[in-house]
Amino acid sequence: MYVRHLALTDFRSWARVELELEPGRTVFVGSNGFGKTNLIEALWYSATLGSHRVASDAPLIRAGAERAVVSTIVVNDGRELAVDLDITSGRANKARLNRSPVRSAREILGVLRAVLFAPEDLALVRGDPGERRRYLDELATTRRPRIAAVRADYDKVVRQRTALLKTASGARYRGDRGALETLDVWNGHLASHGAQLISARVQLVNELAPEVEKAYQLLAPGSRPAAIRYRSGVDVVEAEAAAGNSDEEMFEAALLDALSRRRDAELERGVCLVGPHRDDLELRLGDQVAKGFASHGESWSMALALRLAAYELLRVEGSDPVLLLDDVFAELDSARRQALAQVAATAEQVLVTAAVEEDIPAEWDARRIGITMQDSDGGRISVVRT
């Protein structure tokens, strides 16, 4: 798989750019702040409908513009698919597949399968559980695009159930049974959608675990062994996940039971205390949790191992995913650079950003595309250096 064409309109610092890309290695070279990472971000957005840098879409739209457009042509086993994404702040994104509108932007998921390595990856180890949940859900969605709808439905249930909890707390003291009966209905929705999401995550963790262990050993052969496991606030869910069980019906029953037991606490606090939105992917080195105990080098090795494991899972399922490397070589020591370069050598397409040529492995035969900035009527914009 490779991206043959990338076009951006009013995306971040790019007013307009069209790039013809090729299989093999391409390096975008430019000073920090010149917009090279924005190219990688646009490709990642096309692959996942999310940014690796910001949580909302508003920053993706160039100042003064109403919307941003990301267009790609992806080649997979000789077949071309064109994807156009219209990004508008505060409204649902619109998408076209081979120039025909689709009902939901989620329908383009799976067209571009990519794995991203970025400086932000350290947050996978050192950050909040939300970073690791996002890693699991993005990878699960890349492999099985229907999971995006499961996640969207679950998030909607959590929002509506949280709003109900805030009002139902007072209703309980007034003896209003209607609000509590409505809460029971939403408990069923949360358990149903939550069980599907947990099942997808647990299946993924089961497949990821041996790949993470192997990748970490490659990156840090003298270090402690790496391991991952799914953590849940529901004891039954955690125990079954640890045993490799991903049965949806069992998870649904466990969630319903936990919701029943935590009802008073939820009404008291007005928040959802049960569900996969509170779960975590635990990363371990030897007998210690990586977060808080891993050194800087160990943290980088663990973060890279998670990405390399994702790449391997996607690769064995079909064609190689596109490798996106955003300024990571500058962050790594020589051993980790060499291990990452080894994997990149086998990929069908690798797209890399670097501030200076010296950040790229010397032995790489790669196409260089220079990125610079210039003044325009609308302010400073990124351009390809000619």
UniProtKB/Swiss-Prot annotation:
Keyword presence, DNA repair: yes
GO molecular function, one term: ATP binding
Keyword DNA repair: yes
Gene3D superfamilies: P-loop containing nucleotide triphosphate hydrolases, RecF/RecN/SMC, N-terminal domain
UniProt-listed PROSITE patterns: RECF_1, RECF_2
HAMAP family according to UniProt: RecF
NCBIfam families, sorted: recf
Family of this protein: Belongs to the RecF family.
Function recorded in the entry: The RecF protein is involved in DNA metabolism; it is required for DNA replication and normal SOS inducibility. RecF binds preferentially to single-stranded, linear DNA. It also seems to bind ATP.
Protein name, UniProt field: DNA replication and repair protein RecF
Annotated organism of origin: Mycolicibacterium vanbaalenii (strain DSM 7251 / JCM 13017 / BCRC 16820 / KCTC 9966 / NRRL B-24157 / PYR-1) (Mycobacterium vanbaalenii)
